[in-house]
Amino acid sequence: QQVIWSKVATDLVDNQELKRWAYERKQNDVGRVVSNFGGFQSSDILPKDNSQIDILVEHLDKEVNWCSQQVGLPEMQITNIWLNINPPGSYNHLHNHVGAVFSGVYYVHGEENQGNIQFERMDGAESFLPEYVAKQTYYSASRATYPCKTNGLYIFPGWLKHSVQGNQSNIDRISISFNYETKS
C-alpha cells in the first residue's frame, strides 16, 4: 500500500503574494532542470527569501514530523524547498527524490486540467494478487492519482516514484516542492 498524506491547507499562506513573488523569482533566477519538461523550477529557496515561504515551512515542519511519528521515524528537518511554475503543456516526468526521507508539494495555484500528481509503485506486487481482485483499490493498484488543487498539500516518502501530468489548461500551475531528512 502506498503511503501518501494529503490535506487542504486553506488560509495557511497568502497565495496571491506567493504568485506575485513566484513570477518575480522566475525573472531573477536561472532555475534548474531536474524532472520538469517545459516548466520553471527555481534554485533552492533560502530562509527569509520570502515571509510566506517561511510561514509555509513552519507548517510543513509540523505536518512532516506528524507523518514521521505515524510511521515510527525520528524527527525530520527540511533539506530544501523550491518553486515550480508549469505553463500550459509542461509536465514533470517520473522521478523520485534521492536522499529524502519525506518529500511533498503544496499547490499555490492548481485547478482542473492543470495536471494531477501520479504515484507509481513499481514493485510488481499486482502480479502476486489473486485473480479475484478485479477492482483496483489503493491496495492493489500500481498507480494512484491525486488532484492538482489550490491549497492542496501532499507528503510522501522520498523514494516513491511520481510524475505530474501535463498542464492542459491555459493558466500556469504554481507549486512549492520540498524534501526532508532525519534531523541531525
Language model region names:
Residues 1-73, 173, 180-184:
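Non-heme Fe(II)/2-oxoglutarate
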Residues 6, 83, 106, 178-180:
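Preference for bulky hydrophobic residues occupying beta-strand positions
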Residues 72-81:
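A short coil-to-beta-strand element that immediately follows conserved catalytic motifs
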Residues 81, 102, 174:
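Residue-level detector of short, conserved catalytic/binding motifs and their immediate flanks
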Residues 86-155, 182:
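Catalytic core of non-heme Fe(II) oxygenases with the double-stranded beta-helix
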Residues 92-95, 162-169:
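Short beta-strand His + acidic residue motifs that chelate non-heme Fe in jelly-roll/DSBH
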